[in-house]
Amino acid sequence: MDHVYKGQLQAYALQHNLELPVYANEREGPPHAPRFRCNVTFCGQTFQSSEFFPTLKSAEHAAAKIAVASLTPQSPEGIDVAYKNLLQEIAQKESSLLPFYATATSGPSHAPTFTSTVEFAGKVFSGEEAKTKKLAEMSAAKVAFMSIKNGNSNQTGSPTLPSERQEDVNSNVKSSPQEIHSQPSSKVVMTPDTPSKGIKVNEDEFPDLHDAPASNAKEINVALNEPENPTNDGTLSALTTDGMKMNIASSSLPIPHNPTNVITLNAPAANGIKRNIAACSSWMPQNPTNDGSETSSCVVDESEKKKLIMGTGHLSIPTGQHVVCRPWNPEITLPQDAEMLFRDDKFIAYRLVKP
């Protein structure tokens, strides 16, 4: 704590209306490792440090310490006034509140006695009794400064705050998987007239939509972090680049659970995401009916079947090819390099080859 002596020396000069101390330094050593020694001129006297220091600031404080030691026998009370300035400097460096002094008076009016307290760094320090208010505040400031010097109140904040925040973060991380699983899944119903937009609804608000069979409408079910749909559900499933899974119902009739009748296209995406696309196969009936009035078909031309079927029914899509499925609209214009895979009155699927 040798750096306090420069402040004490300056406070003494201000109290007694003296000239401020003047510092001069000398330097030695190489440029990459200089050493400094300072002398200070105060009250007509020059005080010099006896050794060299690695920094100029340390050398100035050493010289000020010698000057303060020479003034202590003459006016010890004048040295004590520096403690108020030191508390203020500490508050400014730490960006904390300035010290707040409160003084109480006791005794007769012709000979009062003053006792001061100072609130600093979140604590209250009491000084000794003095004959004047100024000396009482000096005493309280000295007690506060010595307490900080001894390390009793270096920290003004709660030391347990970082650990409490860490515990909160850990609890949030542990509870996040349960929260994700507890969230209800959502459905996005896309209509042909708005191919680029969808309406997001919760299943809890519309239970009929959740319980409705696949024959009423062809839906796009969007869910996060769900296990992959097995290939025996007769659906067209694909993982998009942002991790969302799209299950597109491809038939309006219940489909028998026969995994050998489903054609799956496995394509590694550019980011390593596996795309599983299950399409209609040759076993599906043509123009099945639900109630005898409306018909819905899943028609695949023979040429398209040859393109989809290979060996055991699995075809690998080379890197750079993308399968796009969107609502069908007669006004849709396919890209020049598009290869149509499937189309009915609701949806159309085609393949793109991108360089």
Swiss-Prot record:
Q: Which GO terms describe its cellular component?
A: nucleus
Any Gene Ontology biological process: miRNA processing
Q: Where in the cell is it found?
A: Nucleus
Any idea where the DRBM domain is? 4-73, 82-150
Inactivation phenotype: Elongated and downwardly curled rosette leaves. In old plants, rosette and cauline leaves and flowers change to red color. Increased levels of ARF3 and ARF4 transcripts, targeted by TAS1 and TAS3, respectively.
Instruction: Identify the keywords attached in UniProt to this record, alphabetized.
Output: Host-virus interaction, Nucleus, Plant defense, Repeat, RNA-binding, RNA-mediated gene silencing
In which tissues does this protein get expressed? Answer: Expressed in roots, leaf vasculature, shoot apical meristem (SAM) and developing anthers.
GO terms assigned for molecular function: double-stranded RNA binding
Q: Which domain of life is it from?
A: Eukaryota
Looking at the keywords, is Transcription present? no
Q: Which Gene3D superfamilies did the record assign?
A: 3.30.160.20
| Ranges annotated as biased composition (Polar residues) | 149-188
UniProt xrefs under PROSITE patterns: DS_RBD (PS50137)
Q: Where is this region: Disordered?
A: 149-193
Record's InterPro entries? AtDRB-like_DSRM_1 (IPR044450), AtDRB-like_DSRM_2 (IPR044451), dsRBD_dom (IPR014720)
Q: Which PANTHER family match?
A: DOUBLE-STRANDED RNA-BINDING PROTEIN 4, PTHR46031
Role of this protein: Double-stranded RNA-binding protein involved in RNA-mediated post-transcriptional gene silencing (PTGS). Functions in the trans-acting small interfering RNAs (ta-siRNAs) biogenesis by binding and assisting DICER-LIKE 4 (DCL4). Required for DCL4 activity. Required for the 21 nucleotide ta-siRNAs production of the TAS3 transcript in leaves but not in flowers. Plays an important role in silencing RNA of both DNA and RNA viruses. Involved with argonaute 7 (AGO7) and RDR6 in turnip crinkle virus (TCV) silencing. May not be directly involved in viral siRNA production.
Per UniProt, subunit arrangement is:
Heterodimer with DRB1 or DRB5. Interacts with DCL4 and cauliflower mosaic virus (CaMV) transactivator/viroplasmin protein. Interaction with CaMV transactivator/viroplasmin protein inhibits RNA silencing ability of DRB4.
Q: What is this protein called?
A: Double-stranded RNA-binding protein 4
Q: Which organism is it from?
A: Arabidopsis thaliana
Taxonomy, top ranks, is:
Eukaryota, Viridiplantae, Streptophyta, Embryophyta, Tracheophyta
